Design a protein with these regions (language model features):
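Periplasm-facing N-terminal accessory domains of Gram-negative outer-membrane beta-barrel systems
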Residues: 1-16, 76
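Outer-membrane beta-barrel proteins, especially TonB-dependent receptors
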Residues: 11-13, 21-46, 65-73, 77-78, ...
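Active-site-adjacent helical/loop segments in soluble small-molecule enzymes
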Residues: 55
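A short linear hydrophobic-aromatic micro-motif
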Residues: 60-64
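Localized edge beta-strand/strand-to-loop motifs within extracellular or lumenal beta-rich domains
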Residues: 603-604
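Gly/Thr-rich phosphate-binding loop signature of adenosyl cofactor/nucleotide-binding cores
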Residues: 619-621
């Protein structure tokens, strides 16, 4: 669909897209859960430094940033261990409680993204309270196909240079896919801070998949390796000039400078699908090893070394449809072992085992789809203490296809999340948040009730969506600042709990007044509050500001001799002032509003009726606006003594150039 030569009708096809973030393959228009789909073409046409950055502008999405290339996903105001990221069919486990490293996935290998909002799906268990981000690889080639492509990218602000090489094939049902990617960037700059020391990074990744695709199903083995070496932005300034302090005279160096990290993530996944007489059986086993080292005083000696082993398992059975009914049942979970091999440790060593079982049932009528299910989870955690957490969750939802153009979705879901090791046992400086953190062994599990109501409208000239949600969380865990100095130069934060309520909505409209012209706009809003609290502690910390986006896109050519799907687009991104913040003990501050303008052009290059390349040029923050995002962790670093401004600002103007070239395409 995404490479169609006539993208004018793309909005009419979206409701027919098959999504898999629910219990089985389901058309988007029949999904009771709120799901967004981002295609590979859309990902390639977005200016970003990583895959989370690429989807962060979707309605209801946001990101916590720490430096130049580090992003953590936020869905409807919730993130970290409240979101499950799925990649290669297994949940990504990379110590996601930390701010100083992102999701260890090569964005070049992501073929599409499904964003599941809320705890409406029961397949993922604890930690999926806010939703699920499913990063899907491109599908295997068809029988007899061999394909290869090369892509390259350059960004002007931080000198980011990246390339990726990929080859894949299918011969007699034997499938293979191999990829290598490399990316490097020097420090980014903005109008107030100049070049920001410690924001440079280097990323390398590899992937190999071998498997069999047969009439009985498939069996595939996948190996991935991901290496990220980011320096750490400390934000320290000269007391007289207010300028950021550098450890080197070369502000555009691609080399790592102290302090820096080394993050290495390895993964092996065995994915099996078997078609049975009355259904299908899916079985996936995965092993991951995450290694995170921090180097502070010497490039040869690490002070911090976290090593995390994770074994995941997932078995589920899905019946064939009978009389409009579908039934699914499954068992999944994981085993973990975390080791501290450095001199310093923020969290204690621990071992974890969890298991969960679920069952769902759905029924399709001519205009109605009903879906419901129940799940039980149990988690055992052993560190300095022994903890056991368990919870029962469930959901019930319906979709009413009122007519060909109008769908109405309703869903009520119960969510559950056990406290993570950082919340229970932290005791040290967390470089990603630039603060000293203290855990609390007395924390209880979080439970939530969330209700969703959505309306989708699609016609030849207009596509519109609006989705409302209300989320009530008991025992919501967050870090608040306390008046205690544990280490000089760092504020001290302690994890605590309260009852929370989140209300919000996402709305979007795409108008096509003429064949080539698209006028699009979205708005996202979430109000996150603690219940029965005074003004200073009323709002939950680090809640995304209301955001309005608008875009005018004109498609220049369709089926041209040399250019195909050529377009030019002008976009606006307005973040409103965030006055809803946690005021107690100066945990956070208000964030002023700001507006960014963007410009992009793109096209497919054609030779003899065949696509030979995709070209994209994008300019982000076109007017070079100086701003701080409310979710930037660098907002709370040192004050500039010369100007009185606190913290480090986000990236200034950035022009991005991308090219994707298919090297080989054969069919025998």
């Amino acid at each position: 669909m995404e490479d169609s030569t006539d993208v004018f009708y793309r909005h009419l096809q979206l409701n027919e897209v098959m999504v898999t973030g629910v219990t089985g393959d389901t058309k988007l228009k029949h999904s009771t859960a709120p799901i967004s789909v981002v295609t590979g073409k859309e990902l390639r046409g977005t200016a970003s430094t990583n895959v989370i950055d690429a989807v962060a502008k979707q309605p209801g999405m946001a990101q916590v940033t720490t430096g130049g290339g580090i992003s953590k996903p936020i869905i409807r105001g919730l993130g970290y261990n409240r979101i499950v990221v799925m990649n290669e069919g297994v949940r990504q486990e990379g110590q996601q409680w930390g701010d100083e490293h992102g999701v260890e996935v090569d964005g070049n290998g992501v073929g599409s993204v499904e964003i599941l909002k809320g705890p409406a799906s029961l397949m993922y268990g604890s930690d999926a309270m806010a939703g699920v981000l499913i990063l899907r690889s491109a599908p295997a080639p068809l029988e007899g196909e061999v394909r290869a492509n090369a892509s390259t990218e350059y960004q002007t602000n931080n000198g980011l240079f990246a390339y990726s090489l990929n080859g894949a094939g299918n011969h007699g049902g034997f499938v293979w896919d191999a990829r290598f990617s490399d990316k490097r960037a020097h420090a980014y700059k903005n109008k107030y801070d100049g070049y920001v020391p410690g924001s440079q990074f280097r990323e390398r990744a590899g992937r190999l998949m071998l498997g069999l695709n047969k009439r009985w199903g498939h069996s595939q083995l996948t190996w991935t390796a991901f290496h990220l070496t980011p320096s750490i932005v400390e934000g320290e300034r000269d007391e007289e000039t207010g300028e950021l302090e550098w450890a080197t005279d070369h502000h555009k160096t691609y080399s790592k400078t102290l302090p820096f990290q080394q993050v290495k993530h390895y993964k092996a996944v065995w994915d099996n699908l078997f078609y049975l007489p009355k259904g299908s059986l899916k079985a996936i086993v995965g092993y991951q090893q995450n290694r995170r080292q921090e180097f502070e005083e010497s490039a040869d000696d690490y002070e911090v070394f976290f090593k995390l082993h994770t074994l995941t398992y997932d078995v589920r059975y899905l019946t064939q449809e009978f009389g409009g009914w579908k039934v699914a049942a499954g068992v999944n979970g994981m085993w973990q072992k975390s080791q501290n091999l450095g001199e310093e440790a923020l969290i204690p060593e621990y071992r974890l085992f969890d298991v969960g079982g679920y069952a769902t049932v759905s029924k399709d009528w001519e205009r109605w789809t009903l879906n419901s299910g129940v799940r039980y989870d149990r988690r055992h955690l052993k560190y300095d203490h022994t903890k056991n957490f368990d919870g029962v969750t469930g959901s019930v939802g319906a979709v009413w296809n009122a007519c060909k153009s109008l769908n109405v979705r309703m869903n009520v879901a119960r969510g559950f999340r056990a406290p993570n090791m950082s919340e229970l046992g932290s005791d040290g400086v967390h470089e990603g948040t630039v603060r000293y953190e203290l855990g609390s062994a007395s924390l209880k599990p979080e439970y939530s009730w969330q209700a969703d109501l959505g309306v989708d409208f699609s016609s030849k000239y207009v596509e519109a969506q609006v989705a409302f949600f209300a989320n009530r969380i008991s025992n919501y865990i967050f870090a608040k600042r306390i008046d205690r100095v544990m280490e000089e130069g760092y504020r001290t934060y302690e994890y605590t709990q309260g009852d929370a309520r989140l209300l919000g909505f996402e709305a979007g409209v795409d108008v096509h007044p003429m064949h080539r012209l698209h006028l699009g706009s979205t708005f996202s809003y979430v109000d996150a509050r603690q219940l029965n609290e005074p003004e200073e502690t009323r709002y939950l910390p680090f809640t995304p500001a209301p955001r309005w986006t608008a875009e005018v896109k004109y498609e220049l050519t369709h089926r041209g001799k040399w250019l195909n799907n050529a377009y030019v687009a002008v976009g606006m991104e307005c973040h409103l002032r965030q006055n809803h913040y946690y005021k107690a003990d100066e945990t956070e501050t208000a964030t002023p509003s700001y507006t960014l303008f963007n410009l992009s052009v793109g096209t497919d290059l054609m030779v003899c009726g065949r696509k030979v390349a995709e070209l994209y040029v994008m300019a982000d923050n076109l007017l070079n606006r100086s701003y701080q995002d409310h979710l930037s962790r660098l907002k709370y670093t040192d004050v500039n003594a010369a100007t009185g401004r606190m913290g480090v600002y986000n990236m200034g103007r950035n022009v991005v150039m991308k090219m994707v070239v298919p090297l080989v395409f054969e069919k025998r």
